Regions:
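Conserved beta-strand-loop-beta-strand hairpin that lines the nucleotide-binding pocket
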Residues: 1-15, 61-154
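STAS-typified acidic loop motif
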Residues: 15-27
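Structural signature of the histidine kinase catalytic ATP-binding subdomain
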Residues: 20, 41-44, 79
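Short, small-residue-rich loop/turn micro-motifs
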Residues: 29-32, 90-92
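Conserved short strand/loop->alpha-helix "switch" segment adjacent to the catalytic nucleotide/phosphoryl-transfer site
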Residues: 30-54, 108-110
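Hydrophobic residues in the alpha-helical elements that line and stabilize the ATP-binding pocket
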Residues: 56, 60
């Protein structure tokens, strides 16, 4: 499952290949939480990273499997130069990521549809690359003191 703990140049990194199933979400959360603690990421920042990355993985589980029981997702995270990055790649049908849904707050009566909004609110950079062969979400967060922000706020 976990393929690496250090990437090229000795940078802390993780690379996972997991099934697109709901039981993969707590696995990612536990492993990522362990790494954030090991890297001494401040608790408030770690909480923001865990919430945003959990939303990204949940989106891959919900939308990426697309009825395929053997569908998998590739998850990576790394720490380099005071920046944390996290990505999840699924093989789903993709979606139109150009809409305003990514920055729009969901109506309070909705049970779903807040994931991309939450990711944008908590992370410094969110990139969504979606097409017919799947979707990749990249999240980035500056960890240097004063270099980033906790988020834009919900």
């Amino acid at each position: 499952m976990e393929e690496a703990t250090h990437g090229r140049l000795g940078r802390p990194t993780a690379h996972l290949l997991l099934p697109c199933r709901s039981d993969s979400v707590p696995v990612v959360r536990a492993l990522l939480s362990r790494d954030l603690e090991r890297w001494a990421v401040p608790e408030e920042v770690a909480d923001a990273i865990l919430l945003a990355s959990g939303e990204a993985v949940t989106n891959a589980v919900v939308h990426g499997a697309w009825g395929q029981q053997d569908s998998a997702m590739v998850i990576r995270w790394a720490m380099a130069g005071g920046r944390f990055s996290f990505s999840v790649q699924d093989r789903g049908p993709g979606f139109d990521s150009s809409g305003t849904a990514m920055s729009r707050r969901a109506h309070p009566s909705q049970n779903r549809g807040r994931g991309l909004y939450i990711m944008h609110a908590l992370m410094d950079r969110v990139v969504v690359d979606s097409g017919l062969n799947g979707t990749r979400i990249l999240l980035e967060k500056a960890l240097d003191a004063g270099a980033g922000r906790l988020g834009r706020g919900l």
